[in-house]
């Protein structure tokens, strides 16, 4: 969908067939086989993502082989911190925790009716879509002075599913709007009483 060439690899033919319409190329094969990976030319790939679930040994072997064969960037999936340590020691450039990240997102997203969406950034920062507190209605962004009081930036206002990023200190906050804010998670919690 983003215009990149994507190759999917799996040892299970049914899983390969299930993703055919989403990828440029799909191969049935054993990712722990050096011969198989070499035949695909993994050294020419910009990014290799290892998402093997349920068999950490295969994930570790695949990660290590990809790096040995010259893969530029290897991103591997882990379920626990100890797995991440092994993956990083054996060739992974980055490790993702899809289940853990989704659980955290859901916990934050559904912890308050005022949080409409949440994107975690580094160093305890986040972008959140939040409802506008009732006491801010019909006031301007300059009047509430959120940047000075809480060190939070308003990135955009959202109404009827459309983002308005052309906001100024004179922009008035209205009912049925939400706002996209950027700041430290703790500051956002404090400001919006989450």
Identify the meaning behind each predicted range:
Residues 1-194:
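Cytosolic regulatory regions of ion transport systems
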């Amino acid at each position: 969908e983003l215009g990149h060439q994507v190759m999917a690899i799996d040892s299970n033919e049914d899983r390969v067939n299930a993703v055919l319409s989403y990828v440029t190329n799909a191969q049935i094969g054993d990712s722990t086989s050096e011969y198989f990976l070499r035949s695909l030319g993994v050294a020419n790939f910009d990014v290799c993502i290892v998402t093997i679930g349920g068999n950490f040994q295969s994930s570790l072997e695949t990660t290590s082989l990809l790096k040995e064969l010259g893969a530029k960037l290897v991103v591997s999936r882990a379920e626990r911190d100890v797995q991440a340590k092994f993956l990083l020691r054996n060739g992974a450039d980055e490790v993702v925790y899809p289940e853990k990240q989704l659980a955290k997102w859901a916990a934050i997203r559904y912890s308050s009716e005022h949080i409409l969406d949440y994107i975690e950034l580094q160093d305890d920062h986040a972008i959140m879509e939040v409802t506008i507190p009732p006491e801010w209605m019909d006031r301007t962004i300059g009047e509430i002075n959120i940047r000075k009081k809480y060190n939070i930036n308003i990135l955009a206002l959202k109404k009827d599913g459309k983002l308005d990023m052309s906001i100024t200190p004179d922009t008035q906050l209205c009912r049925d709007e939400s706002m996209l804010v950027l700041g430290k998670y703790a500051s956002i919690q404090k400001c919006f009483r989450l």
